[in-house]
């Protein structure tokens, strides 16, 4: 089954925040983080969307190793929804509240 891939507009802001951190801390790592994101979203998740660990009810995530960032997504029969890029040390309750509010309607 081929599912439609949708990326929430908020993901751009999430990536910008991560890139801003690395612009100061390790600018040579920005391309690496971006490439891992693209690989996760365009290859790894679509190939096996249920293979990655649950994050919250109805949501899964894949870490962009070796970074501490992960991609949060959900799947339906019709689509794979990429909802956020978050740092693994963020407050889980705050992350869940924000992610659950991100819709495509």
Swiss-Prot record:
The keyword Magnesium does not apply. Gene3D superfamilies: RelE-like. Keywords: Toxin-antitoxin system. InterPro entries: RelE/ParE_toxin, RelE/ParE_toxin_dom_sf, TA_system_RelE-like_toxin. It comes from the Bacteria. Pfam families: ParE_toxin. One of its GO terms (biological process) is symbiont-mediated perturbation of host process. PANTHER family: TOXIN PARE1-RELATED, TOXIN PARE2. Toxic component of a type II toxin-antitoxin (TA) system. Upon expression in E.coli inhibits cell growth and colony formation. Its toxic effect is neutralized by coexpression with cognate antitoxin ParD2. Belongs to the RelE toxin family. This is Toxin ParE2.
């Amino acid at each position: 089954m081929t599912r439609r891939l949708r990326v929430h507009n908020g993901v751009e802001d999430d990536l910008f925040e991560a890139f801003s951190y690395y612009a100061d801390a390790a600018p040579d790592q920005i391309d690496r983080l971006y490439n891992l994101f693209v690989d996760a979203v365009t290859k790894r998740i679509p190939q096996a969307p249920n293979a990655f660990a649950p994050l919250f009810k109805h949501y899964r995530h894949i870490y962009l190793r070796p970074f501490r960032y992960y991609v949060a997504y959900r799947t339906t029969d019709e689509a794979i929804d990429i909802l956020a890029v978050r740092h693994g040390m963020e407050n889980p309750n705050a992350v869940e509240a924000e992610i659950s509010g991100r819709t495509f309607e």
